[in-house]
Amino acid sequence: MKIGILSSGGDCPGINATIRGVGKTAIMHYGMEVIGIHSGFVGLLNKDVQTFDERSLSGILNLGGTILGTSREKPFRKLLASGESEKPQLIRQNYEELGLDCLVCIGGNGTQKTAGMLSAMGLNVIGVPKTIDNDIWGTDITFGFDTAVNIATEAIDRLHSTASSHKRVMVIEVMGHKAGWIALYSGMAGGGDVILIPEIPYNIHRIGETILNRLKKGKPYSIVVVAEGIQTDGRKRAAEYIAQEIEYETGIETRETVLGYIQRGGSPTPFDRNLSTRMGGHATELIANGQFGRMITLKGNEIASAPLEEIAGKLKLVTEDNDLVVQGRRMGICFG
C-alpha cells in the first residue's frame, strides 16, 4: 500500500511527531510506501511531494511546526462553492496518479471538513485532529493543546510576581477564537482570579467588584485571563479592552499582555509527543485494516476513531457545567 500525509491549517506542536508516528509505523511495521505532501491541499493539487523513508522520519519527534509545510488554503471548498468541478476532479486525478491507497490529513476543523468531502468523493482518507484550541468535536483532547496550556501557564506564573510587586491587575490574553479551553485550563492552573471565555457572557461591573473585593481582603493585585474570542467593542483586542474597562471600573492600574503565536511554536510537551505518536500509529492501523473515512480520537485514555461525516462543522465548546468551571466558581474565581 502507498499512503500520503499532509498537514493543513495553522502550525501546531506535535504535527511532526504525528508524521513520524504514521510514517514509521507504515514503513517499519506494515511495509507500506509513504510520501509527504507539501503545503497542505495545495501540494495535492500541484503534486508537490517527497518520499519518506525511516531515515527521513528520524530526528523530528521534538520539532515544532511541520516539516511538510502548511497553508490555510482550502481549495477544495472554494472550488466547490464556485462551481469549478474540474478542480476537484484534478485532486482525484492526482491522488490516482500518485498511486495513493489512502490520504492522511492532519489538521483542524477546516481540514477535517475537507477530508470528509474528499471521502465523499470516494477517496480513502483518514483524519488526524490537531489544534491548540482543543475545539474539535469528537475527541477529548487534540495534540498541541497541552503544549499551549503549559506555555500560557508559565507566562501566568511569571506575571504573578510583577503584578504583586506593583499592586496591579494583569490581563493575559491567550488563544481561543470560539472556544475557551486554553484560557480555562491555563487560568485555573495559573491561579487566575478572573477567567473570561467566549462561551460564558461577562459583566464588566461584576469583574470590577471581584477585583475590589480582593483589594478589601488585603489582596492588592489580580490576574485576569481572557480568551482572544470574547466579546469586546469590536475595535480593540480582548486584553486591551478588558484592561481599560477594569482600570475605569476600579481605579487600579491595569496592564495587558498578549501571548499570541508563542503558544503555537516550539517543541511539544512529552504528553503531546506521546499523544501524536499514538494517534499516528492508530491512523496507520486503520489504513492497514481498510477502515477509511474516519478521524482519530482520544476517549478517556483510549485511542479510537469516529466517522468524518459526524465531525464536520461541529465545535467542541466549554459548557457551564464543565467540572473546572464548577470548581473554579466554588473557589471564588469569577467567570464574568
Model-derived regions, located:
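C-terminal non-catalytic interaction/assembly regions of soluble proteins
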Residues: 238, 242-336
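Glycine-rich oxoanion-binding loops at beta->alpha junctions
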Residues: 46-103, 143-150, 154, 336
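N-terminal phosphate-binding or glycine-rich loops at protein starts, especially the Walker A/P-loop
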Residues: 1-48
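Short Gly/Thr/Asp-enriched flexible loops that form oxyanion-binding sites at enzyme active sites
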Residues: 18-22, 109-123, 183
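Short, acidic/small-residue loops that bind anionic groups at enzyme active sites
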Residues: 31, 38, 119-142, 196-203, ...
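Accessory alpha-helical/coil subdomains and C-terminal extensions
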Residues: 94, 105-107, 115-117, 144-252
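Flexible, glycine/charged-enriched surface loops at secondary-structure junctions
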Residues: 31-37, 162-169, 220-223, 251-259, ...
